[in-house]
Amino acid sequence: MTISTLKRILQPKEIHFAIEAGHDHRDAINPDYKDRADKDPELVAEIEAITNQLIRDGESVLYAMGLEADDVMATMAFQHGKECILVTADKDMHQLIDLCRIYHPYDKAEITRSDVVKRWGVETYQLGDMLALNGDKADSIPGVEGVGPKTAAKLLKEYGDIEGILDASDEMAVSTRKKIWQRIASGKQDLIDSRNLVQLVVDADIKRATHEDLIKIGCRSLGENK
């Protein structure tokens, strides 16, 4: 979807592009978070080139040092509420559905609160806990082995949140002898870490990027395309 198409459909007063500037915040929780060793170098170069071109064209490119684009968007949503429309296909951003509006660029449709509840089977305030229980191997978010969306939804409906699940885990691991409860009881810190990893930052120090900033945050293509 092109920028001009987005502007025509959504008719925003202004438009901003969020970029990643590291993930130091989450590396401190899990050093293996989003290990980039196997990331496609061609895709990285393409994203960097597009970012450079956006700045040349005078577009507003936003970043927060040490944080991800998700955190920039979450902060904007927290600051601007329903006036903010996030254009994203990232499921993690569904956590913000009560704060702002979300537009799916591939489906070309706005995601509603009922869409989110129907997809995940939990209340919107439980979505972060849902994502933490499920985990995400691609991002090195451990979660709980054997817990998928249906099981996570069942646990959250019964115990309310991760704290409630953790409080019940020792007793349930003994009384039920179920592997899922045993894994939760023996991996409490992993589950807490998973919750902290998926939690979005809503008070990021956002700055508008310049070409010099891109060098600082590691856009390797800048030297070639300057």
What residues fall within each predicted segment?
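Non-catalytic nucleic-acid-binding/docking modules located in mid-to-C-terminal regions
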Residues: S4, I9-H16, D38, E48, ...
